[in-house]
Amino acid sequence: MSTNNSDIRVVVGMSGGVDSSVTAHILKEQGYDVIGIFMKNWDDTDEFGVCTATEDYDDVIRVANQIGIPYYAVNFEKEYWDKVFTYFLDEYKLGRTPNPDVMCNKEIKFKAFLEHAESLGADYVATGHYAQVKKVGDEIELLRGVDNNKDQTYFLNQLSQDQLKKVMFPLGGMEKTEVREIATKAGLATANKKDSTGICFIGERNFKQFLSEYLPAQPGDMRTLNGEVLGKHDGLMYYTIGQRHGLGIGGDGEPWFVVGKDLKNNVLFVEQGFHHDSLYSDSLIATDISFTTNSEKPKTFVCTAKFRYRQTDTKVTVNMREDGTAEVVFADPVRAITPGQAVVFYDGDICLGGGTIDTVWKKGAKLNYVG
């Protein structure tokens, strides 16, 4: 055990899952002064909102006691509602498909939580994210996690240098199977706990039902781009670009897919065939651009990009515009680009940053049917 590390205080965001449990265990084994914090971001007494918070906190307590670290629960419900959930609802009202995990990392896990950790004398915060940080000169690079299937840099694309300088990601160099093995070997209470999936405040519940409690659904026509009415939709907010299931269109031939929305007239556009031309575009405009390093970027640069989590990288050219937005031009047409989702830029394994997809284009024209 290193004696130097005992002078370094690391506050670990513990969710009650195996990843954050192993994170705390590893840091404790390495001799750091470790404190576990459970973030309560959602009111689980609410009739609709469940994050299984009580069970999860019980697991945090069990693991913290096993590895011998102090633990606390901190309430970030107000911050979460104001910064993440309100944004989530506002995006759906606009007919877009938001990514609350990106906003949660930016505003809660690496802002509100980081500030709280610093009030406890933390030198660093650590989480169970599958990502890596590396010091290069005066800057910290954000790198993909070794486990390609679990890499979470897509959701961390908005982190700044000030945030990255304060974080540790002990799992970034591991495969998920290794993490489970460490948990089992250490006898951690969460070793066999199932991974959480989906959006935490929705939990295991039906997404449609959850959303309808906060936003009134407005059913309307489901049409082709040529205007043929094929049925009714339940409310534009329930559908995303490229969606196949839940359309209720029968008949022969290939399946039908959502290709766009007309918010003003409350119309959902659908077309037949996975590779229908209307699903493809060759560029987009992104807003809320943020870079993970402070070094000056050229106005135009070539890199790769992801337009959704776990998607294969696509080669792109990024043209930064005077208004701070970015035009992202694809080397080859891409299917089902979705406004509201994140576009994230990479140079090899380095996550350069990203932004929010705003408008979608093809052959120099904006695809108005997409949004």
From Swiss-Prot:
So where does this one cross the membrane? none
Site label Interaction with tRNA, positions: H129, Q341
Q: Which GO terms describe its biological process?
A: tRNA wobble position uridine thiolation
Keyword list (alphabetical) reads:
ATP-binding, Cytoplasm, Disulfide bond, Nucleotide-binding, RNA-binding, Transferase, tRNA processing, tRNA-binding
As its record notes, the protein acts as a catalyst of: S-sulfanyl-L-cysteinyl-[protein] + uridine(34) in tRNA + AH2 + ATP = 2-thiouridine(34) in tRNA + L-cysteinyl-[protein] + A + AMP + diphosphate + H(+)
The positions annotated for binding ATP are G13, M14, S15, G16, G17, V18, D19, S20, M39, G128
Principal localization?
A: cytoplasm
Q: Outline the segment boundaries, as ranges, of region: Interaction with target base in tRNA.
A: 99-101
* Cellular component, GO, one term: cytoplasm
Q: Does the keyword Iron-sulfur apply?
A: no
Where in the cell does this protein reside? Cytoplasm
Recorded hits in NCBIfam families, A to Z, give: PRK00143.1 (NF001138), trmU (TIGR00420)
The UniProt family comment states: Belongs to the MnmA/TRMU family.
Mind telling me what this protein is named? tRNA-specific 2-thiouridylase MnmA
Please tell me the species this chain comes from. Answer: Listeria innocua serovar 6a (strain ATCC BAA-680 / CLIP 11262)
Name of the gene: mnmA
